[in-house]
Every structure is written in C-alpha cells, then in structure tokens.
UniProtKB/Swiss-Prot annotation:
One of its GO terms (cellular component) is T cell receptor complex. V region of the variable domain of T cell receptor (TR) alpha chain that participates in the antigen recognition. Alpha-beta T cell receptors are antigen specific receptors which are essential to the immune response and are present on the cell surface of T lymphocytes. Recognize peptide-major histocompatibility (MH) (pMH) complexes that are displayed by antigen presenting cells (APC), a prerequisite for efficient T cell adaptive immunity against pathogens. SUPFAM superfamilies: Immunoglobulin. Residues 1-21 form the signal peptide. This is T cell receptor alpha variable 34. PROSITE patterns: IG_LIKE (PS50835). Alpha-beta TR is a heterodimer composed of an alpha and beta chain; disulfide-linked. The alpha-beta TR is associated with the transmembrane signaling CD3 coreceptor proteins to form the TR-CD3 (TcR or TCR). The assembly of alpha-beta TR heterodimers with CD3 occurs in the endoplasmic reticulum where a single alpha-beta TR heterodimer associates with one CD3D-CD3E heterodimer, one CD3G-CD3E heterodimer and one CD247 homodimer forming a stable octameric structure. CD3D-CD3E and CD3G-CD3E heterodimers preferentially associate with TR alpha and TR beta chains, respectively. Its main location: membrane. One of its GO terms (biological process) is adaptive immune response. It comes from Homo sapiens (Human).
Length: 112
C-alpha cells in the first residue's frame, strides 16, 4: 500500500517597518503527494524580495525554520529539500525530492 502525504501550504508574512503591505502568494495552496514522488511549492511576492524564509510545521507542533535565501539565484538544500530564490521573478521555489512521511506538514514562506 502506498503512503499518501498531505502537504498544506500557508503564507507567513514578515513586516519590517519600512515594508508596507508585502503580499505573498503560495502555490499550489494544498497538495497530496504519494510517498517517493517529487513536489514543488512556489512563493511569489508583490514587491522586491530582500530575504525569503521557508518554514515547516508538523501537525500539533511549532514552526521549524528550514532555510533563508537572500541573493538572487541562491540555492540551498537540506534533507531532500531544495529552495531557490529568483529575484527577477520575485519568487522562490521549494522542491522536495522523493517525498517521505517525515515531509508531511504545513509549509510556509515569509519575506522581508
């Protein structure tokens, strides 16, 4: 029997005093993935990104910081999770390779 992972997506907006009404859109908004499959989550900003943060929240637990991206073209990886920042498109993508049950949870992006 194949395991099905549920990944919920959310937006976590950080506001600095000099940034007003930063809007982030994450897509897809929800996702169900079979174990072993790859998945990609995108986070797009309405304004210039100076820093983008990815978090994960397991059911019933607090936020877990995954990574921070600050430079355009920057790419970081940790435990089958890779994130990349594209400043020109004002977006970041989070890619999970060969998903496992430990990847289930809510993924959030935040920006400043």
């Amino acid at each position: 029997m194949e395991t099905v992972l549920q990944v919920l997506l959310g937006i976590l907006g950080f506001q600095a005093a000099w940034v007003s009404s930063q809007e982030l859109e994450q897509s897809p908004q929800s996702l169900i993935v079979q174990e072993g499959k790859n998945l990609t989550i995108n986070c797009t900003s309405s304004k210039t990104l100076y820093g983008l943060y990815w978090y994960k929240q397991k059911y019933g637990e607090g936020l877990i910081f995954l990574m921070m991206l600050q430079k355009g073209g920057e790419e970081k990886s940790h435990e089958k999770i890779t994130a990349k920042l594209d400043e020109k498109k004002q977006q970041s993508s989070l890619h999970i390779t060969a998903s496992q049950p430990s990847h289930a949870g809510i993924y959030l992006c935040g920006a400043d």
